[in-house]
């Protein structure tokens, strides 16, 4: 390889002035040489291509970030129809519904969990969730909706059920309300997990002919995949939401673009730790795909990287 080819891009200092915009700052990240800053720039450029192209954009994420202010970022992406498909976990329903009606509170990682238990406060990282802001309010809101839906028909697909929950919540702060409003399907492969999952189980125990047909969700996903000209994905964290996203994309020879934000490492062979490079071997990401792995806290990186698109 020609030495000059390796030395054609000098490292430039970041220079911030009072009028510097976030997109200008991210542009400077791209010329700064290292380390995660350059990856944030690469992710921004890939996401810009996703949003500007005629392609189907997937957004996958775990539930924990919905307990934080990052919920507002996800909600804006949905509200502005910048994403076409959401794949997440059942806790997203829990936190989205609960926070529509009750507050969560800023806490700390370092506190006596035994004391919190005695006080009726649950800790999610450094977010404090009072008992009254979680299980009871979810039951209070979800069970009457299930009663209504059951009277309408006995069997629902998962994504249709989520739309119906969002429709009845009818609150602009809610992700699932805006997903319903914009007809963006929300897929939850692990539908029976979490508090809303427990409500579904409880309702089933009282109404044994009630059904959630998750294979209808898979049918809907297959239609989306096979109709897509191109696909891109913004994947936050790993687990089932990431895997279901890349799993379905293997049936069209892989994603065309992908941005993966994670703190997990690949040494243990986990799906969460697996780099996008590994997904190429499984045909879940295309060989010629444009992609980047960004290591860091999604509650910092995601708002920064998508802020220019939300102005």
From Swiss-Prot:
Pathway(s) per entry: Protein modification; eIF5A hypusination
Presence of the UniProt keyword Transferase in the record: yes
Stored InterPro entries: Deoxyhypus_synthase_arc, Deoxyhypusine_synthase, Deoxyhypusine_synthase_sf, DHS-like_NAD/FAD-binding_dom
Any one cellular-component term (Gene Ontology): cytoplasm
First-level EC class: transferase
Highest taxon, organism lineage: Archaea
Record-annotated active site: 284 (nucleophile)
Keywords: Hypusine biosynthesis, NAD, Transferase
Keyword Zinc assigned: no
Catalytic activity, as annotated: [eIF5A protein]-L-lysine + spermidine = [eIF5A protein]-deoxyhypusine + propane-1,3-diamine
Any one GO molecular-function label of the UniProt entry: deoxyhypusine synthase activity
Cofactor(s) annotated in UniProt: NAD(+)
Bilayer-spanning residue ranges: none
Enzyme Commission number, as recorded: 2.5.1.46
Protein role: Catalyzes the NAD-dependent oxidative cleavage of spermidine and the subsequent transfer of the butylamine moiety of spermidine to the epsilon-amino group of a specific lysine residue of the eIF-5A precursor protein to form the intermediate deoxyhypusine residue.
Family: Belongs to the deoxyhypusine synthase family.
Listed NCBIfam families: dhys, PRK01221.1
Protein name as annotated: Probable deoxyhypusine synthase
Organism listed in the record: Picrophilus torridus (strain ATCC 700027 / DSM 9790 / JCM 10055 / NBRC 100828 / KAW 2/3)
Lineage of source species: Archaea, Methanobacteriati, Thermoplasmatota, Thermoplasmata, Thermoplasmatales
